[in-house]
Amino acid sequence: MENNNELKQLEEKELSSELIYSGTLLNVYRDKIELPNGKTTGREYIKHNGAVCIAAMKEDGSVAVERQFRYPMHRIVTELPAGKLDTPDEIPLEAAKRELREETGITASSWTYLGDMIPTCAYSTEIIHMYLAEGLEFGDRDLDEDEFLNVS
């Protein structure tokens, strides 16, 4: 938790902001800022709507995982079901329910909010909202046309 004195010592203040790239997933900005010592510098960062991540707990105590090729990494990775918020004001729990069903075909009768994670705060505004899903029922997936993944 921050206090006012610490905020005065550490806060960087925006002087100007420029959108340098606008995409379907994220927007990139370049801001001119004033440092706590009064000097100015630049910051480049990504504005992101946010995301959700779901630990879908099966009856045997294991969790559902996905395997998919992640282009930036150029390899197949194992992940928990997750997805982005469609809009900045989308309710995270609704996004979590949607993403779990679309990607895995799983619906859950019980949802527990686990907290938020900020994975890359040095250069992104993305916040990942974490949920535990229990009481699972398995059905058909509804993947986006550009999604290819395996679920176990």
Regions found by a protein language model. Give the residues of each.
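Acidic, metal-coordinating catalytic segment for phosphate/diphosphate chemistry
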Residues: 12, 16-53, 59
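Conserved Nudix-box catalytic region and its N-terminal flanking loop in Nudix hydrolases
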Residues: 9, 43, 53-98, 147
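A short coil-to-beta-strand element that immediately follows conserved catalytic motifs
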Residues: 107-114
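Short, solvent-exposed loop/turn elements at beta->coil junctions and helix N-caps
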Residues: 16-19, 116-120
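Active-site-adjacent beta-strand/loop module that shapes the phosphate/pyrophosphate-binding cleft
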Residues: 29-37, 120-140, 152
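Short alpha-helical functional segments enriched in proximate histidine and acidic residues
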Residues: 103
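NUDIX/MutT-family hydrolases
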Residues: 49-51, 145-152
